[in-house]
Amino acid sequence: MTVPARGFLLLRGRLGRVPALGRSTAPPVRAPGGPRSAFRGFRSSGVRHEAVIISGTEMAKHIQKEIKQGVESWISLGNRRPHLSIILVGDNPASHTYVRNKIRAASAVGICSELILKPKDVSQEELLDITDQLNMDPRVSGILVQLPLPDHVDERMICNGIAPEKDVDGFHIINIGRLCLDQHSLIPATASAVWEIITRTGIQTFGKNVVVAGRSKNVGMPIAMLLHTDGEHERPGGDATVTIAHRYTPKEQLKTHTQLADVIIVAAGIPKLITSDMVKEGAAVIDVGINYVHDPVTGKTKLVGDVDFEAVKKKAGFITPVPGGVGPMTVAMLLKNTLLAAKKIIY
């Protein structure tokens, strides 16, 4: 079954805000017939059913509605409309698709956007000059450089060239550092998307075992930081016991960890890395993977994640699909960061 859109609103309405992921004394998912029978759609007793499929598309629609209301409220107070500047280098089809989606989503919530398109042979110096100009432009709330960049450009230098307070991707060294110190920051959008999926779905992490497969500085590491840190700190964390796996983790060792995990988050870029024998009954599986593979049935290329979805959904308690899971949520959290940057809440 797929979680309906209203389920997210009901969950928040019943439990209130859950900043510390699982600090509620009452579990968010009740067995049928309990005092909160409205939650029976999330679990069932008796015969084992397939996992609840978490619709990131539907959840993102609700978040975008919240952002749109926030933008309208901000403007009604006489403030400038939030403005997102996107720098796109080269002609990578996937990057162009991602940027179009971001521009379309920004428009839908009332955020102005502009696209600065540069050829793949653009110099690093020119890109830094552009970020400097945008940093000083008072009308620009947020700046995003679509990755990856060409090999001759130092991505870290470009990301650090964006002012931290306008770094809506959350990749600046100051934002990453503040995240690691449990301080408020602009959080990388994909990590924030995973966090939001967990909290809005009511997946428990307090004292639970979590495996994060993938240690990239923009995805895996920020996700692990959010989930293992103290729920009582300035920027509340998930209070989970987190294991990080990576390319040098032997498959059998990874399997040992995932079989014990209550939550598995996969961001490795390897199709079908997680199979059903690696997942314990009722675990939550969040698939961040983006892979394009050949479909032997249609003869075309299709998008898949890192999880063997059809097999794992028969065993997991919750699962996100690809497409339609973390992807739409990542765009929504980018827009949320843009509004936060415009309101100067963090910096």
UniProtKB/Swiss-Prot annotation:
GO terms for molecular function: methenyltetrahydrofolate cyclohydrolase activity; methylenetetrahydrofolate dehydrogenase (NAD+) activity; methylenetetrahydrofolate dehydrogenase (NADP+) activity. Substrate binds at residues 98-102, 145-147, 323-327. It catalyses: (6R)-5,10-methylene-5,6,7,8-tetrahydrofolate + NAD(+) = (6R)-5,10-methenyltetrahydrofolate + NADH; (6R)-5,10-methenyltetrahydrofolate + H2O = (6R)-10-formyltetrahydrofolate + H(+); (6R)-5,10-methylene-5,6,7,8-tetrahydrofolate + NADP(+) = (6R)-5,10-methenyltetrahydrofolate + NADPH. It is a peripheral membrane protein. It is found in: Mitochondrion inner membrane. The keyword Magnesium applies. Bifunctional mitochondrial folate-interconverting enzyme that has both NAD/NADP-dependent methylenetetrahydrofolate dehydrogenase and methenyltetrahydrofolate cyclohydrolase activities. This is Bifunctional methylenetetrahydrofolate dehydrogenase/cyclohydrolase 2, mitochondrial. It comes from Callithrix jacchus (White-tufted-ear marmoset).
